[in-house]
């Protein structure tokens, strides 16, 4: 088990963006699931971040096919994200 964050005393505030990532390794198989949530209502800036990152993920998935390198997939994602800064 790997922890990406350290629990603390800070209470979640309205508009905070949370990422919950669960990874399982069992019998040589790796499974990973990640979900983003907003505490309350997202600000305009946070909503843009959530929308752009979700669309970037979809474009990365669409780019995967035989012969395409991880670098090619990353480039597809990066180009999309940089157009939406």
Tell what function each PLM region has:
Residues 1-85:
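Active-site neighborhoods and metal-handling regions in enzymes and metal-associated proteins
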């Amino acid at each position: 088990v790997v922890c990406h964050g350290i629990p603390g005393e800070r209470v979640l505030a309205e508009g905070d963006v949370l990422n919950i990532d669960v990874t399982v390794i069992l019998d040589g198989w790796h499974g990973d699931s990640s979900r983003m949530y907003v505490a309350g209502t997202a600000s305009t800036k946070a909503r843009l971040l959530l929308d752009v990152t979700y669309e970037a993920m979809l474009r990365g998935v669409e780019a995967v096919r035989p012969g395409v390198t991880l670098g090619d997939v990353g480039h597809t994602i990066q180009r999309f994200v940089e157009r939406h800064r």
